[in-house]
Amino acid sequence: MHTHNNFKTPSDADELDDLDDDMVIGVIEEIAQEALVGEDESDSDIDEHDLADMEAPEPNQNADENESISSDSSFDPNAEDSSDSDDSMLEEDEAEGASSGEATSAKRRKDDNDGPCGSAGDSAAFDLDDLDDETDETVRAIIAAIKKPRSAPPEIKLEDFITDVCFHPDRDIIALATIIGDVHLYEYGNEGNKLLRTIEVHSKACRDVEFTEDGRYLLTASKDKCVMVTDLETEKLKKLYETAHDDAINKLHVLDENLFATGDDAGTVKLWDLRTKNPIFELKEVEDQITQMITNDQKKLLLATSADGYLTTFNIAARKLYVQSEPYEEELNCMGIYRGSSKLVVGTSKGKLYSYNWGYFGYHCDMYPGIKSPVSLMIPITDRIACVAGEDGNIRACHITPYRNLGVVGQHNMPIESLDINTSGELLASSSHNNDVRFWNVKYFEDFGDIKYNDKHNAYKEKRHNLPSSKCTNASDFFSDLTKEDEDNADNNDAAAGPSNSA
């Protein structure tokens, strides 16, 4: 509190007598003057608009009133001044407080009526209404996309590296093999995926996982040189082929409910029967890793590709070599059967696709340039369409005989490790080095017509074209929408103009 030197608290009657009335009145007037100055300084922050809102008089108006008061002839300097009393000062303070309270409440009522932004709030609301009208179609499109049902299951993400995936032949179950030797069984669906169980099968990396044709057993091959057969109903081990190979097993192929074949890193191929302990036969015709094995519906021939560039064919019934191809200066990584089992197509590490007539596997009859990046995986989608994938992270569809790039089915951020398709041929699953499994609905390939040899095509655009299952869109789709909109506007203008009345 600010103190004044002229104002003293009397301690006795003598000091009280020393205080005259003029001194007391002067001190009171000084305190009142400072209070008024403080109020003026606090009110100086209010701008002219706030003064108008509080119905305060304008500065010029105050000046005029002061002049009129000073020029009033009725003013008597000798008249008794009632302002010297304390009671009159209190009444003036109460009157000022009441007037300021009324002004504040009036301003508060005006602010409540105008909203937080006053008159600007109305213009802002108007702009938002215009914005809503302009973006109405975009909002509707976003809502429709959110409400649109999924056409494929969501992504599955694991902590461990996924080495292989395999669909169950009868149920909506997919098996995921991992680098730590475990197998995860998931029940998949468009609404979500559910982990059914995790089976610890191998002490080292599980490189391949397959179901038997009847779906009763799960077969796994591992780097620990073992093959394990697990009963899915009881989750118990049915059979263990310990040290099935002298080297790490890389590939496993199921022929039927009893027969299966295995291939290791040293090029040895063995054929097994679940009803026996020992292999039916064993052949070693190459010196490098077996990359894939396959057979047709007749199951008379077993074909194997290897990393040293050979396509080797075994006669199952005779248990001997049928034919071996000429060596290629590139790795043969994958293969598929097409055209009613009349064509075999092999993918290589240089991105090429070699075509063979069935039964004549000594040398290819045709060669396609492919995608110019290593083709590590191949899955037949239809009798004439294949999906290939590799290190670039893209899954591409191509037409076989004649060869055409159809476009991109799906994408991963890292190289793709495995591919598989379900029994109905509608759902494709892929895993990548990012420890994820993605699903792609490829049912639209059923509507693809056959391609003729003399059909005109643009190879550059076909290689980069995104198919319906892809998560990316084509730049041409944006302009096609604009063209469609222009055509609709033109039709509306023609309809509004009406038919021409010619004389």
Curated annotation (Swiss-Prot):
Amino acid composition bias (Polar residues), ranges on this chain: 59-76
User: Where are WD repeat segments found?
Assistant: 157-196, 201-242, 244-282, 285-324, 327-366, 411-450
What's in the keyword line of the UniProt record?
A: Repeat, WD repeat
InterPro entries given in the database record: WD40/YVTN_repeat-like_dom_sf (IPR015943), WD40_repeat_CS (IPR019775), WD40_repeat_dom_sf (IPR036322), WD40_rpt (IPR001680), WDR55_POC1 (IPR050505)
List membrane-spanning regions: none
List compositional bias (Acidic residues) regions by residue number: 12-23, 37-56, 78-96
Stretches the record annotates as Disordered:
1-131, 483-503
Please state which protein family the record places this protein in.
Answer: Belongs to the WD repeat WDR55 family.
Query: Which named protein is this?
Result: WD repeat-containing protein 55 homolog
The top of its lineage is:
Eukaryota, Metazoa, Ecdysozoa, Arthropoda, Hexapoda
